[in-house]
């Protein structure tokens, strides 16, 4: 399955294809000053499910608490956006370290079907 990157804000998305890997939803306008990151992730998943926006409605997606630091490089995930792996829901890597682990969750080693990435 080719990777798909969504860009834009709110309800406006464009899709670009990348070679290999899982489907990665990339969302611009990550606000590092917003503390409720789990709420942002949950709302974004609902938007992607609504009106057939690339995420199948029956996809099971758990969302776990985001740790304070990236599990690999230890960079603060308060200042750097985390990547959420789906369906397991772990958000243990920063966007830079996530590039090294294409189809496997760093924390639980399960297969990743979708990724929810936030960029500045």
Curated annotation (Swiss-Prot):
GO molecular function: zinc ion binding
Keywords: Metal-binding, Zinc, Zinc-finger
InterPro entries referenced in this protein's UniProt entry, alphabetically: Znf_RING
Zinc finger (RING-type): 70-109
Protein name (database record): Uncharacterized 13.0 kDa protein
Species per Swiss-Prot/TrEMBL record: Orgyia pseudotsugata multicapsid polyhedrosis virus (OpMNPV)
Lineage of source species: Viruses, Viruses incertae sedis, Naldaviricetes, Lefavirales, Baculoviridae
């Amino acid at each position: 399955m080719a990777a798909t990157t969504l860009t834009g804000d709110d309800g406006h998305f464009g899709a670009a294809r990348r070679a290999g890997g899982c489907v990665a939803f990339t969302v611009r306008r990550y606000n590092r000053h917003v503390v409720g990151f789990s709420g942002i992730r949950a709302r974004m998943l609902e938007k992607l499910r609504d009106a057939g926006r690339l995420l199948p409605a029956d996809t099971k997606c758990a969302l776990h608490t985001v740790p304070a630091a990236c599990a690999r490089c230890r960079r603060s995930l308060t200042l750097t956006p985390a990547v959420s792996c789906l369906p397991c829901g772990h958000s243990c890597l920063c966007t830079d370290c996530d590039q090294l682990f294409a189809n496997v969750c760093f924390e639980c080693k399960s297969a990743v079907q979708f990724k929810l990435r936030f960029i500045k």
